[in-house]
Amino acid sequence: RYEEFMKNILTIREKEIFTLLIQNKTTKEIAKILNISEKTVRNHISNAMQKLGVKGRAAAVVELLKLNEISL
């Protein structure tokens, strides 16, 4: 199934970053929380969007919500 395939496509870190994004955290705040650089945060977001086949963080969040990968 498509949903099962997509469920395993993102890394734990990518899911973690989107969980923080929906909590209204900035890239800078996420970097500080996870002890990684802002560039690394942006790379994770970009990689996740590419894997999900979407453009933009909001579209990625919608897709992750549909897949029950993150929750509000």
Positions of predicted regions on the chain:
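Helix-turn-helix DNA-binding segment
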Residues: 1-40, 67
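Residues within the DNA-recognition helix of helix-turn-helix
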Residues: 13, 44-47
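DNA-binding alpha-helical recognition surfaces that contact promoter or target DNA
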Residues: 19, 43, 62
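Short linear sequence elements within intrinsically disordered, low-complexity coil regions
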Residues: 23, 48-49
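Helix-turn-helix DNA-binding elements, focusing on the entry/boundary residues of the two helices
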Residues: 27, 45, 57
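Basic, Lys/Arg-enriched C-terminal extension of HTH/homeodomain DNA-binding domains
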Residues: 49-72
